Amino acid sequence: MALAAPLPTVAARPRSRLWGVPIYWHLLSLDAPTVAVLWAWSFASAAHQRVPFVSIAVLGVGTWLIYVADRLLDVRSPSHPALRERHFFHERHRRVLFLVSPVVGALLLGLICAMPPAARRDDTILFAISMLYFGGVHLPALRVRRWFPREVAVGILFALATAVPAWSALDSKPQLAWFVLLFAGLCTLNCIAIETWERSSNTPRSMTVSAMAICAAVASIALLTMHGHQLPGEFAICASAFTSAALLFTLDGVHRRWFSRSSWPEDRRHFLLALRVAADAALLTPLFFLSLWHL
C-alpha cells in the first residue's frame, strides 16, 4: 500500500526485556483481546454459565483482527497528528500483518462455524453494526465523528461483544444487563482517557476523565450494594470495575501533574506510551478477583 510520506519509527523502544513485554503486548494489539477475554470470563461467572471455549476464542481472535484492521486503516493518512506508536508499528510491519491476517481470519471462520447458534446470531448482529462504525470512521463520505464520538461507539460495541458469550446462553437477559452497562461505561472512560492524554492537553476536558472515573466507581458501589454482594461472580465484576475506575482516576492525576512539568518531547513520548499501556492494564482487574475467588 503506497503512502504519501514515510512514517516515523516507533518513538519509544523498550529499555529492557521486562519492560518490552507490556510494550509489545500493546503494539501487537494483544491488549484489547486480553481485556475482552477476561471480562467475558467475568460475565460468565456472574451469569453462572459455563461458556464454551470456542465462544471465548471467537471473541479473542475477532477482537485482534478488528483492532489490527482499524490501525492499518488509520495509517492511510501518515501525517495525521493522532497517529501513535501502535500505528507506526503496524505500518512498519504491514506486510507481515497482511500475510498473517488471512490465516487468522480463516481460523476465525472455523471457530464461528463451531460456536453455539445463539452466540453466532448475536455476534453477527454486532459485526454488522461494527462494519457500519468502520464505514462511519474511515470512509471520508461517511465521517460521523462530529455527531457521535468514536470513544463512545467503541466503548459500547466492545462491551456488548464481550458480553455475548454469556449473554447468549441466558434465558433472563436483565440478570446481566446492569453489569454490561457498567462495563460499557468503563470502556468509554478508558477510550476517552486515552484520547485526552494522547492529545497532550490540559484543557477542561482533561478533568472529564477524573469525573467519569468517579462516576464509574460510584456506579460500581451502587451495583455492588444492589446485586454484587449476593454471589462471588457478581462481586468480582463490581470490585473489578471499581478498581479499574480508581486506577484510571490515578493515571489521570499522574498525567496532569507529570505532563505539565515535562518539556522534553522524547520524555513525553515515553511517558505517553507508558500511560497508554497502563490504561489498558487497568482493565485487567478481573484477573485478580476471579483468581482470588477460585483459590
Q: Over which residues does each language-model region extend?
A:
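Catalytic cores of Mg2+-dependent Asp-rich isoprenoid enzymes
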Residues: 2-65, 85, 101-109, 179-182, ...
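Membrane-interface helix-boundary motifs at transmembrane edges
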Residues: 80-88, 113-119, 141-146, 171-174, ...
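Transmembrane alpha-helical segments that form the membrane-embedded catalytic/substrate-channel core
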Residues: 61-76, 128-140, 183-199, 244-256
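Intramembrane alpha-helical segments
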Residues: 90-166
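Solvent-exposed interhelical
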Residues: 65-99, 184-219
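Structural signal for the C-terminal ends of transmembrane alpha-helices
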Residues: 45-47, 112-116, 135-141, 166-170, ...
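Functional transmembrane core segments of multi-pass inner-membrane proteins
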Residues: 151-193, 199
